[in-house]
Regions:
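Catalytic centers of hydrolytic enzymes
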Residues: 1-149
Length: 149
């Protein structure tokens, strides 16, 4: 999970300014183990805050950016019934299994979720710079993380 600030980055060199536009406060990288049912609960919570029928219940206005899973959702369904199926890689999410998760700030994973929460010394900007040095040039393809069905 990451932040949503800044405009999309156009193809070409990614600058330090671009990185700070993505995640301006440069928080530390955190990890936590989430059980499958917590992942579904978090997704349902986020979808309700995004697509609530009552506009006064809407908060944030976006579905969190995520990577590493695919969720098939019915936006029009009532709260708690939007997530239809989740896959981690090619495997269906197992509600009783723990999954290692990486995030930044409690906006990514609220403190009520998970076990073995750790805040690491590496900070977000340094992690992004390391990633870019390994995987440039980048290709940003749609991954179908959230699919409305």
């Amino acid at each position: 999970n990451g932040w949503r600030y800044g405009a999309p980055i156009i193809p070409g060199e990614v600058t330090l300014n671009d990185l700070y536009n993505i995640i301006p406060m440069n928080p530390p990288i955190s990890t936590v183990e989430l059980i499958g049912e917590e992942i579904v609960a978090m997704l349902e919570e986020n979808l309700e805050r995004t697509f609530a029928r009552d506009p006064y219940d809407q908060m944030g206005g976006y579905v969190k950016r995520s990577l590493g899973f695919n969720a098939y959702i019915k936006i029009e369904n009532p709260p708690g019934q939007r997530v239809q199926e989740v896959f981690v890689g090619d495997e269906p999410l197992q509600t009783g299994r723990y999954y290692p998760t990486t995030f930044v700030t409690e906006q990514g994973v609220a403190g009520k979720y998970g076990r073995n929460r750790r805040h690491h010394t590496e900070r977000s900007i340094e992690a992004l710079k390391t990633y870019l040095s390994r995987y440039s040039p980048l290709r940003a393809e749609l991954r179908g993380t959230f699919v409305a069905v």
